[in-house]
A protein has these predicted regions:
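Conserved ABC ATPase "signature" region
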Residues: 16, 20, 28-45
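A short, proline-enriched helix->beta-strand linker immediately N-terminal to the Walker B motif
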Residues: 65-76
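Helical segment within the ABC ATPase nucleotide-binding domain
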Residues: 88-101
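H-loop/switch region of ABC-family ATPase nucleotide-binding domains
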Residues: 109-110
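A short, surface-exposed alpha-helical micro-motif characterized by mixed small hydrophobic
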Residues: 115-117
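Conserved ABC ATPase "signature" C-loop
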Residues: 127-128, 143
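ABC ATPase "signature
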Residues: 133-134
Length: 147
């Protein structure tokens, strides 16, 4: 997430750059721009260079751009470990919305409560080897030592 953000560009410019990298056309970015900024909640800073953003602001904007690309497959790697609780809830709701729309979500997380909420299948790796692949509730049991 955030691949392609350039620290010397403003949030606005990075939305266009990152959106293009993620496959959006200029027209699609323009049509989604206000929604991207609204979701990220960084209105007052959109014209500030991202090198001055906090890590939370940076990740909010990166997540917002990514979910507005209308992905068929969405990869989430510990993204919700950063950010305040209201924003985390907002992200979870957006992820659930994507899942309800038939999108595929791959989550890398150590937050077992989170994956239990948003996933239906779990893959457990141990030292790079497959330990379990099946229903999320069973995967969580395996992780917690109940296998």
């Amino acid at each position: 997430m955030g691949a392609g953000f350039h620290p010397d560009l403003t949030g606005r410019d990075n939305v266009y750059l990152n959106g293009a990298i993620l496959g959006m056309t200029k027209d699609e970015i323009e049509a989604s721009f206000d929604s991207i900024v609204d979701f990220a909640e960084i209105h007052d800073f959109i014209d500030t260079e991202v090198k001055f953003y906090s890590s939370g602001m940076y990740l909010r904007l990166a997540f917002s751009v990514a979910v507005h690309t209308n992905p068929d497959i969405f990869l989430v790697d510990e993204i919700l470990a950063v950010g305040d609780e209201p924003f985390q809830k907002k992200c979870i709701a957006k992820i659930q919305e994507l899942c309800s729309a038939g999108k595929t979500l791959a989550v890398v997380s150590h937050d077992l409560d989170l994956v239990s909420k948003i996933c239906d299948r779990g893959v457990v790796l141990e030292h790079g080897n497959l330990r379990f692949d099946g229903p999320i509730k069973e995967a969580v049991k395996v992780i917690r030592g109940g296998d």
